Design a protein with these regions (language model features):
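Glycine-rich flexible loops
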Residues: 16-248
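N-terminal amphipathic/basic-hydrophobic helices that include classical n-h-c signal peptides
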Residues: 1-15
């Protein structure tokens, strides 16, 4: 075997293996969605980014979850260009790319059409902070970005969806590092986090909070918003400088 052949084989192996960690990570994260009851059929997708490599891995479009493997995950750059993969990436890839490119502190994104969160999105309503489960995770209502106008819809739709989210956060004075979830009016939820696993966690939390808020309004349609002192207490005991929740 010639040295040239060995060098070529080593190069190919390195090219294949350098993305393996995010392909494995995003495969495992995607497989959590049906287990958690957050997706039906091929709805939904998870991506995981590697900032040093300047790419993210994402679920291929329209492939059933029981047919997914780490090797089928598609590698994409932050401009939405496919770098490596035999399958087409998720139809929502450009939305993920826009968020990664503009929000540098996130490394995982989830998009689902989970039932209760999507119902709030279709109703074009923020999810009010009614209870401490909500306050354990964020101090504001879950925001709902307004529906997109016709110009955005008929343009580069998925790309513009990303900017609809970013613009709403800027206009509302929200910090994406604190509020790691959003509803897109008439559409569905997106969540994110420092890892793909955290983004999946946030997606599950959002669905639970959405269901609780819906049921709260059925029981008492004049239910008051959680008072600020309880919001502060519950959020800071988990996330504040003197947090004492958990074992660390």
């Amino acid at each position: 075997v010639s040295l040239i052949t060995l060098d070529v084989n080593q190069f190919i192996f390195k090219e294949m293996s350098k993305y393996q960690h995010i392909k494995q990570s995003v495969y495992e994260a995607n497989m959590q969605l049906p287990k958690l009851g957050l997706v039906l059929f091929t709805f939904g997708n998870v991506s995981a980014a590697d900032r040093e490599l300047g790419v993210f891995a994402i679920k291929p479009s329209g492939v059933p979850y029981d047919e997914l493997t780490p090797e089928k995950m598609v590698i994409v750059d932050f401009d939405g260009n496919t770098i490596k993969g035999d399958l087409r990436p998720s139809s929502d890839t450009k939305t993920h790319a826009v968020l990664y490119k503009n929000w540098e502190h996130i490394n995982g994104i989830v998009h689902t059409h989970s039932t209760y969160a999507t119902a709030w999105a279709q109703s074009q309503r923020c999810i009010p902070i009614y209870g401490t489960t909500h306050a354990d995770h964020l101090t504001a209502d879950v925001p709902c970005a307004p529906p997109m106008d016709d110009e955005m819809i008929t343009g580069d739709y998925e790309y513009q969806t990303g900017f609809q989210i970013i613009n709403h956060f800027e206009q509302s004075g929200l910090d994406y590092k604190e509020t790691e979830m959003v509803l897109v009016g008439n559409h569905a939820p997106f969540t994110w986090g420092k890892t793909a696993e955290k983004a999946v966690y946030n997606s599950a939390v959002l669905e639970a909070v959405a269901q609780m808020a819906y049921l709260t309004e059925q029981i008492n349609n004049n239910a008051p918003r959680l008072k600020d002192s309880l919001i502060k207490k519950h959020f800071e005991r988990k996330h504040g400088p003197d947090s004492y929740y958990g074992q660390s």
